[in-house]
C-alpha cells in the first residue's frame, strides 16, 4: 500500500493497532513485521507509573470482550528511556497514546516530540462511568478541550480518541477539533457489565469497557455521525476482523482504522487485512 497522511501523520497504510492491544510493540515483533503496520499506537501512558485495576481484568462475552485494565503502564519516562529504543529499528510511525491532566499531557507531549520516530500523539479521552457521573457533560467536554489544547501546544500532530458513552460523541469531536486535534478516533470501548447471580461483578470493577465485533455496528454509526460534523480526519475503531469491516468504516467516512481486540486472538490480523485490501 502507498503511504497516506492522516491527521498530520504520514502512515505506511490506513491500518493501525488500537492503543493497549500491542503494548509498546516490541512484544509483537516475534509474531509480525512491525514495519508492515500503517502505524503503531502505544499503550496509553501517564506521567507516573500505574498499577492498574484489580483482577480479574477480562471477561469474554459473545462476540466481545469486557476489560477493566485501569490504564496500567510503566510511565512515559520508561517508554522514552527503554521501550522506544526497541522500536526505532522497525521503521514504523509511532503514535504515542497519553492521558492525564493538561499539565501532565503537555509535559509528555514535549518529551515525546524529542523522539524522531514518534510521529504523533493520541490523547485518550476515556472517562469511566463513575467519573462521568461526577463530572457531567459540560465539565467533561471542558476537560477534553483542556487536554487537547495542552497536547496541541507541542510540536507533534494530535489525535483525540473519543469515548462513545460520555455524552454525545459528536459534541466531543467538535470540542476536540476546536481545541486543535487534527484527527479524531471513533471510538473507545463501550461501558458494559457482567454480573454473577449474586449481583457481584465478574471483573475487578463493576463497569468495564466492551470491545470486539459486538460493538462494530455501534462504532460504524458513531464514525458516520462524526464524519459528517467535523472537518478533521476520522479514524474508525471497534470490532474490525476482516477487510470488509475496514471497507465499511471507510464507507462511513473514516480515512483510517485502528484494530484492537482481534490482535489478541490473531496477532497477524492487520497484516492479513492489509494483504486482502
Q: Where is each model-derived feature located?
A:
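Catalytic cores of alpha/beta
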Residues: 26-31, 105-115, 166-179, 227-230, ...
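Glycine/Thr-rich beta-alpha phosphate-binding loop at enzyme active sites
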Residues: 65, 127-139, 172-228, 232, ...
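Glycine-rich beta-to-alpha transition loops that act as phosphate-gripper elements at the mouths
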Residues: 22, 98-100, 162-168, 216, ...
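N-terminal capping/small domains of soluble enzymes
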Residues: 1-93, 99, 106, 273
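C-terminal helical cap(s) of enzyme catalytic domains, especially alpha/beta-barrels
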Residues: 52-62, 195-208, 250, 256, ...
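Glycine-rich phosphate-binding active-site loops on the catalytic face of alpha/beta enzymes
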Residues: 42-47, 123-129, 183-193, 239-240, ...
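Conserved alpha/beta-domain cores
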Residues: 78, 88, 97-154, 162, ...
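Hydrophobic faces of well-ordered beta-strands that scaffold small-molecule active sites
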Residues: 15-19, 38-42, 94-98, 121-123, ...
